[in-house]
From Swiss-Prot:
The keyword Magnesium applies. It comes from Azobacteroides pseudotrichonymphae genomovar. CFP2. ATP binds at residues 9-16. Monomer. HAMAP family: IPP_trans. One of its GO terms (molecular function) is tRNA dimethylallyltransferase activity. Substrate binds at residues 11-16. This is tRNA dimethylallyltransferase 2. Its EC number is 2.5.1.75. The lineage of its organism: Bacteria, Pseudomonadati, Bacteroidota, Bacteroidia, Bacteroidales. GO terms for biological process: tRNA modification. InterPro entries: Dimethylallyltransferase, IPT, P-loop_NTPase. It catalyses: adenosine(37) in tRNA + dimethylallyl diphosphate = N(6)-dimethylallyladenosine(37) in tRNA + diphosphate.
Amino acid sequence: MRSLIVVLGPTAVGKTKVAIFLAKYFQSPIISVDSRQLYKELPIGTAAPSIVELNQVKHYFVASLSVTDYYNASKFEKEAIALISNLHQKYQTIIACGGSMLYLDALCRGIDEIPTIDPKLRMNILSVYRKEGIDSILRQLRTHDPTFYNLVDLKNHKRVIHALEICLMTGKPYSQLRCGNVKKRSFNIIKIGLNRERQELYNRISIRVDKMIENGLLEEARRVYPYHHFNSLNTVGYKELFQFFDGKYTLDFAIEKIKRNTRIYSRKQIAWFKKDKEINWFYPNNIDEFETSCLLDTISHKSILLT
């Protein structure tokens, strides 16, 4: 049976390096599972694969959309599964790589169909939002779906409101609806998780952000600032710089906020992934070395068990 090897883990842990190693070893392409690397205007702030890396291995779902395009995990699931089906006609093994939690769940587990919201319910929720503010909505979401409450960006009011709409419409937690029923895939899935000691990961995050600034993140953010109201740009690395452009932050403070918010996001990723008992975890000894033989042995062993 054909396989999909999924390399996942928190931001800045070193997923791309491992994914490219595996892609070269298996002579296969890479499917990016990153909800922001999709956007062609954001190569620096999303740590998208470099031109050299893209030339080394064929990547899919990288720089394929504009920030003005609407996209979600449901669309990704449909397109990625169709692509994998086609690629498996040529490749025995395909590599997927990313850290976007909902997109990974969409790929590996599938997403239930999201129902259409009753207009009256939507009006009622929006009325509460206008009268009482986002805090009232957040309290309700925490009651109905504490899992998604701990995952979502609480400053993304649109996403918070939509999640509450789904909870009240279906009587089920939004997080459960998104990945409650596991869809059987036509291929084996082997999950490789990467993690590091917390302080080492934090140091890598800090170094990465500094390099992003050196490489032109400020200019990149300025170019997309006219589109800052799009959900694609409501993400760490850009929203903080938009505050700087608006005169609300100093540049130094914005950079520190990027580092802090990235650390927070990494903790959410780790907490989310730790719930998945199918993940085979690896902890590199230092920032440059990775025990590739152990990794390949694990993949081989899992492949045998799944056949």
